[in-house]
Regions:
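Domain-level signal for soluble alpha/beta catalytic cores
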Residues: 1-246
Length: 246
């Protein structure tokens, strides 16, 4: 609640970003202490700093932006953001990244209790599914219609980001990616086919960009994945069976 109130004040220009971050720091420190109290050996920050579980991470990449729009979801109209490619996708480790600050803070809190910190990031497929399938945009300002080049650069950007986290002491990353479960939903698959793609083609994109993203990962870094049927305001986004994409 404290973070919600501080974020509302920040959005209304009532407080500076540093003041919002101080509130986030305080509440995340309390969360980590509670996780340890309940016996967790790997702790997270609960993504307390994020507005969107995936977009706030993806905004760390150069060449990526978002589009605001209204969309009818689960029986009601909602104001949402979707990701867009606006240039060459890359990750610059020399920039000051909010997500790296978040990691450094979490790692420091975890070290106070002798437990490990886990960093959660959204997967590379989310860039593809928002731009090409959710928004239905066929080309990009930098790549044109060359989706192979897009896949290659997204993979390289993830490699650079993973290496940056490693250099900051991260040894456990969880990649969250609901894009796979878009493709179990017959309604969404029909939309994909209406755009001129096939389910097999899109799944092939996902396999290749996800594989590329993990190339050259440090041998002693643990990388896990998570996917589900989405959770938008307490309701699933997709319906179907996982075995249709397994």
């Amino acid at each position: 609640q404290e973070i919600k109130e501080a974020r509302a004040k920040f959005n209304n220009n009532e407080i500076a970003y540093e003041q919002l971050r101080d509130v986030e720091d305080e509440q995340i420190a309390k969360l980590v202490a509670k996780e340890v109290q309940h016996g967790l050996k790997f702790v997270t920050d609960g993504e307390f700093r994020r507005r969107w579980w995936h977009l706030d991470w993806l905004k760390e990449f150069d060449g990526f932006t978002t589009k605001h729009l209204d969309k009818f979801i689960n029986g009601r109209n909602n104001h949402i953001e979707l990701g867009m490619i606006e240039g060459k996708i890359s990750y610059d480790p020399n920039k000051a990244h909010k997500e790296m600050y978040a990691w450094d803070f979490l790692k420091n809190e975890a070290s106070k209790y002798g437990v490990e910190a886990k960093k959660c990031i959204s997967g590379p497929n989310m860039i593809l599914i928002d731009h090409f399938l959710q928004l239905g945009i066929k080309d990009t300002p930098y790549y044109g219609t060359d989706i192979e080049a897009v896949i290659d650069d997204i993979g390289l950007a993830y490699q650079a980001a993973i290496r940056d986290f490693y250099n900051h002491g991260c040894r456990y990353i969880q990649i969250d990616d609901t894009s796979w479960t878009y493709m179990i939903d017959d309604t969404f698959v029909s939309k994909v086919e209406g755009l001129g793609y096939t389910k097999a083609q899109v799944l092939d994109w996902f396999v290749r960009v996800s594989t590329k993203a993990l190339e050259n990962r440090p041998e002693d870094m643990q990388i896990a994945t998570h996917f589900c049927k989405g959770n938008f305001k307490g309701n699933p986004l997709f319906h179907g069976f996982y075995d249709t994409i397994a």
